[in-house]
Amino acid sequence: MYKLASCCLLFIGFLNPLLSLPLLDSREISFQLSAPHEDARLTPEELERASLLQILPEMLGAERGDILRKADSSTNIFNPRGNLRKFQDFSGQDPNILLSHLLARIWKPYKKRETPDCFWKYCV
């Protein structure tokens, strides 16, 4: 009986930090479904780039979301166009320009070999 009570207290002790985590407001989350037939044709690099394009605006909005909410707390309705305008006013930069700069750093151009006489590690 003593072991059962100590196990329950231990379980509740580990469960308590998980229950104290904040819940996300369902109005702020945008659900995006992608078509499976389109994703099947994309290369891994294109999938990575597409996932960055989807994730980055959400991350930027989460970082500055508290500041923007304090600035305009009168509206509780989610408006993506309005959030883009708020982002432009706050940072002074277009989000598309920021995304293109970040993606340009990731992309590496394909380099051809200088000597066509070499195959794999064997050169003639």
UniProtKB/Swiss-Prot annotation:
Q: Which UniProt keywords apply?
A: Cleavage on pair of basic residues, Disulfide bond, Hormone, Secreted, Signal
Q: Which GO terms describe its molecular function?
A: hormone activity; signaling receptor binding
Q: Which cysteine pairs are covalently linked by disulfides here?
A: C118-C123
The domain of life is Eukaryota
The UniProt entry's GO CC annotations, sorted and at most eight, read:
extracellular region; extracellular space; synapse
Q: In which tissues is it expressed?
A: Brain specific.
Q: Which residues form the signal peptide?
A: 1-20
The record's InterPro entries line, in alphabetical order, gives: Urotensin_II (IPR001483)
A biological process (GO) annotation for this entry? muscle contraction
Concerning Pfam families, the annotation shows:
Urotensin_II
Pro-region residues? Answer: 21-110
Location in or out of the cell: Secreted
The family classification in the record reads: Belongs to the urotensin-2 family.
**Free-text function comment from the UniProt entry:** Highly potent vasoconstrictor.
Q: What is this protein called?
A: Urotensin-2
Q: What is the primary gene name for this protein? A: UTS2
